[in-house]
Design a protein with these regions (language model features):
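A bilobed periplasmic-binding-protein/Venus flytrap-type ligand-binding module shared by bacterial periplasmic
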Residues: 55-56
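Flexible coil segments in periplasmic/lumen-exposed cytochrome c-class electron-transfer proteins
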Residues: 19-49, 64, 79-138
Length: 138
């Protein structure tokens, strides 16, 4: 089940936001660094959020709670760009496999910044998710 969970986190795009340098390295990140969160923020109209360190979260979250959170976005912090609408469509077995994979990695501290409200400038790097309208041609 752990192997299935690893596979699902890869094809589900979880590493894109929850693993530092995943996208820049085209997925060539040491497995010991996966799912420890990202220090690069995602900024939009809601403010700036950071991919959470799932390895720390699963240490204090039960498997049943994980399934509920990913099935219903009942985390109290379901802000974009987390695609709750996708994880809510996953079956329970797959969600449990993902939990077991992340849990198998063990805890790893990574110093992820706290999210910021709209209008507050982040101190570190971020990816802008604000749509930009093209300029009209004269």
């Amino acid at each position: 089940m752990v192997q299935a969970g690893e596979y699902l986190t890869i094809v589900g795009g979880c590493n894109d936001c929850h693993t530092e340098n995943w996208t820049a390295s085209e997925g060539k990140v040491d497995p010991s660094d996966r799912m420890a969160g990202m220090k690069t923020g995602f900024r939009g109209s809601w403010g700036t959020v950071y991919g959470k360190n799932l390895r720390i979260i699963v240490q204090r979250m039960s498997e049943d709670r994980w399934v509920k959170v990913l099935s219903t976005a009942d985390s109290g912090d379901g802000r974009p760009p987390m695609p709750w609408w996708n994880t809510a469509k996953m079956n329970e077995r797959d969600l449990r496999a993902m939990y077991r994979y992340v849990k198998s990695l063990g805890p790893k501290a990574n110093g992820i910044p706290r999210g910021l409200p709209a209008g507050k400038e982040p101190a570190g790097p971020y990816i802008s998710l604000t749509p930009v309208e093209p300029k009209a041609n004269p």
